């Protein structure tokens, strides 16, 4: 894997020398006198850059493709019409792969080392939690990927691919567990604050987030008991959500930026429209099934981009609980939070759930109903693609051919520059990752 230009996107002013354009392979060189080595960026400057790279990626191309394959949105013009018909090539995935490795994983190696050396426990906890989230987001669409040998630069420019099931996923759990331990210790000399763009250094909020990510983790691997237990330790309300609110005015949310520049390329999908219409979900349709341009009422320039949310956790509880009353309460909580997410209030929510087709009452809710409401509630959230792969809900009809994509291609650059990359496979888009049912 040949990593290229490291780009820093910090909310702080960072003075970067000409080394901005050097290869990240040099980042790990033993030659401290290397004139092309990057400047020594402090943790407080590196952290927001890393976090924003994850948030931008998740709300950008990860959502564009994953939610298109999940049939929440559809490509209707230019190259996106071809992508919608599953005519997509490995080169299209160079950017998201590069973004995660160069701007997140490689940078985190240095941040973790500095935090460890300095005894900055809470910075280290945030770094590990962020890495775990980014790893899961990446492996869930790519499957096996370089991890244990990634970021070694000149030492190994052809890192081996680690197994998702036996290496990557266990590493995710370990990182999350370690982060909880660190958050329960004293901060150390440096205390995270406004440089943590997600929680402003609030370690109690981070603990809730880690438990919430663990709930998703266990759900993916089919461990419902632990998914339920972790979900109950996670977010208690929407105010706990793990995410970032874009300020707008040029620093815009990813979907707004896409729609502003690529107006007419993507639209609301008929599959989701049909499901919502069948449930008389007119109020939410009025917020979502709108022309995808800069005036979209939900996909605004100042949209909050949640990495994981209270509504997702409530649907996890509804799916995994065996207690009928608990399942029903969580189901309704998830729907209500989904209404609030798009700016709707109690009156609209009450009218909607008054329908027996939506809420059949305690003891009568089916898994299909839970997953359909989660599918609606996680609009443009990549997790909707994971849910479909886990459960097969909703039933999706292929746009082209005989199958719906279940993952992404490996990027073209991996085939060109990493001798350890898997052999090319034209059918890879339709093959399952390890946890896919």
What is each of the regions a protein language model found here?
Residues 24-73, 87, 231, 396-437:
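Membrane-proximal, proline-rich intrinsically disordered regions
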Residues 45, 222-317, 322-373, 377-378, ...:
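Hydrophobic-face positions in mid-chain alpha helices that act as interaction patches
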Residues 24-25, 173-186, 203, 207-259, ...:
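Aromatic-residue-lined binding/catalytic grooves and analogous aromatic/hydrophobic interfacial grooves
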Residues 48, 75, 79-146, 152-187, ...:
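Conserved, well-structured interaction surfaces
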Residues 24, 203, 285, 300, ...:
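Long, intrinsically disordered, low-complexity segments
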């Amino acid at each position: 894997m040949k990593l290229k230009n490291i780009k820093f996107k910090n909310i702080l002013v960072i003075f970067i020398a000409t080394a901005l354009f050097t290869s990240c392979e040099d980042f790990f060189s033993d030659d401290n006198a290397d004139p092309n080595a990057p400047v020594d960026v402090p943790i407080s400057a590196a952290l927001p850059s890393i976090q924003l790279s994850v948030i931008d990626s998740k709300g950008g191309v990860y959502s564009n493709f994953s939610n298109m394959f999940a049939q929440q949105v559809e490509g209707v013009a230019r190259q996106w019409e071809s992508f919608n018909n599953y005519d997509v090539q490995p080169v299209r995935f160079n950017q998201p792969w590069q973004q995660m490795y160069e701007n997140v994983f490689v940078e985190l190696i240095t941040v973790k080392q500095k935090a460890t050396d300095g005894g900055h426990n809470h910075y280290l906890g945030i770094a590990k939690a962020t890495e775990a989230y980014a790893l899961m987001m990446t492996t869930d669409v790519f499957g096996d990927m370089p991890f244990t040998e990634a970021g070694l630069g000149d030492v190994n420019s052809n890192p081996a691919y680690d197994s998702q099931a036996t290496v990557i996923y266990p590493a995710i759990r370990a990182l999350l567990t370690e982060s909880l331990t660190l958050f329960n210790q004293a901060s150390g000399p440096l205390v995270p604050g406004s440089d943590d763009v997600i929680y402003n250094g609030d370690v109690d909020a981070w603990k809730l987030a880690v438990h919430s990510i663990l709930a998703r983790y266990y759900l993916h691997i089919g461990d419902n008991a632990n998914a339920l237990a972790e979900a109950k330790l996670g977010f208690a309300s929407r105010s706990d959500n793990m995410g970032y609110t874009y300020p707008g005015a040029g620093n815009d949310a990813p979907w707004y930026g896409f729609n502003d520049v690529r107006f007419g390329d993507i639209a609301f999908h008929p599959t989701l429209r049909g499901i919502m219409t069948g449930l008389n979900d007119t109020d939410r349709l009025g917020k979502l099934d709108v022309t995808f341009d800069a005036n979209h009422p939900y996909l605004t320039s100042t949209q909050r981009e949640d990495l994981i949310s209270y509504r997702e956790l409530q649907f996890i509880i509804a799916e995994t609980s065996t207690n009928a009353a608990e399942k029903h309460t969580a189901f309704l909580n998830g729907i209500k939070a989904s209404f609030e997410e798009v700016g709707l209030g109690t009156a609209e929510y009450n009218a909607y759930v008054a329908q027996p087709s939506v809420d059949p009452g305690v003891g009568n809710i089916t898994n299909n109903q839970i997953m359909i409401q989660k599918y609606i509630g996680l609009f443009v959230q990549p997790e909707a693609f994971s849910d479909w792969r886990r459960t097969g809900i909703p039933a999706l009809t292929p746009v082209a051919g005989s199958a719906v994509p279940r993952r992404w291609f490996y990027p073209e650059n991996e085939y060109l520059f990493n001798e350890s990359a898997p052999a090319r496979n034209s059918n890879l888009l339709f093959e399952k990752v390890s946890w896919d049912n």
